Amino acid sequence: MMRTFLSRARDTGRDQGSVPTAAATSRTGRTRPAACALALAAALAAPAAARAQDPAPDSLRAAELDSLRERLRRAEDAIELLREQLAAQAASGVQTRTRVRADLFGRVLTNAFYNDAAVNNADVPLFVATPTTPSGEERPQGGLGASVRQTSVGVAVSVSHVLGGDFLGDLQADFFGGQQPSTGGRNFPLLRVRKARGIVRWARGELLAGQESPLVADVDPVSVASVGTPGFTAAGNLWLWAPQLRGTLQLGTRARLAVQGAVAAPTTGDPAAPFDTDVDAAEQSKRPVLQLRLRSRWGEDDTRGEIGVGAHRGWVRSADGSLVTSEALVVSAEVPLTRVVELRGEVYTGQALRGLGGGGIGQNLTAAGEPVRDRGGWAQLDVRPRSYFQFGAGCGVADPEDEDVPAGRLRNVVCAAHAIARPGGGVLVGLEFRRLRTTYAAGPEENDHLNLAAGFEF
């Protein structure tokens, strides 16, 4: 047995590839007998020690087996649940022809509304109308109704490694495109494109092509009562979505400054014919809209803020064939005061701004063909004490020069308060009260608007 043990010890040393030095060999020669003796004693003592130990009780082994079985069962259940979730996710995804994953999103929204005076639009009023029409007929003084035409739907895609950056694209549509003359009227609304964007983002810039909000006025108030037309339109909010090519270059400073520029399609904002459309007065200028903006951002996620200063310039052809300049200077901001309180808003000054969405209370040129000078703005405070509940209030005003519109709308002030709850499962409920006050040469007209919204998001 001793020979066998020593032989195995020598084989182990060779397998480990040890190459002892002369000094090490000398020391090993003197210590090898003692080491072998100790190893032999340990080998002989091990069986005795093992026999001296009492075997584990059968009950303890059974408990250990039951515990292992329970943990194995829970692991199998978790794996099965994960498989079901992955299968459901794969089934819910939309596979496009280009094999790019597309995500559907949207909001089904029912709005019940009440007005106590004549307004320009029943479910989303922008200003108060005069009690009588220009021909002298009495207007209906308020009413009660409901609609689902602020329902919206969209699709989004994202692809990595496109032109050295990341590509994001989306299409957003709603049913606020008006209605065909029919028995159903507002209950059978027309589909309308809101935004359609393709964006390539790099580390220090991005390029956008498609239909988007004006570069200089890219902030809207929070509301589930005024979605088809953003809140405070014709009362300080410039919003009209338009086709454009937009670029952003980050300057890499501590203030996270960025320079933005856009070339947009010209428009006066005038109503178009139902089917065949012609060029409007802005398109007749044969010049695009030019916009430039300098912005600064700070914070992340719930505490991210932004402030920007932008300039807008466009052209409109007047009745005598001359070109009238549309221009504006706009300051917009989203400022998180705390993690649950945010202040947002815009202020502007300019002229001939109907093409940006409600500027000049929808009045572009004077009777003499001169631009309507205008100034306005809005601000809203929004509080979100819980992830499922938020409330807030704000006001907006548009104030054209009285001498430019002596027979038109001289001033429009809108104040609104809202509360929105999302109890879970995508369900949402919102309540908004809005007071509108529009001033004419004959005096102010007022309307109280109450809107109850209910629906779900997906």
Label each PLM-derived region with a short phrase:
Residues 285, 292, 297-409, 413:
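Detector for outer-membrane/organellar transmembrane beta-barrel domains
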Residues 115, 176-182, 212-218, 229-231, ...:
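Sequence/structural signature of outer-membrane beta-barrel proteins
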Residues 421, 446-458:
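Outer-membrane beta-barrel "beta-signal"
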Residues 51-123, 136:
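N-terminal periplasmic/intermembrane-space "pro-region" immediately following the signal or transit peptide
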Residues 93-130, 134-269, 286-301, 306, ...:
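Outer membrane beta-barrel
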Residues 1-30:
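N-terminal secretory signal peptides that target proteins for export/translocation
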Residues 35-45:
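Bacterial N-terminal signal peptides
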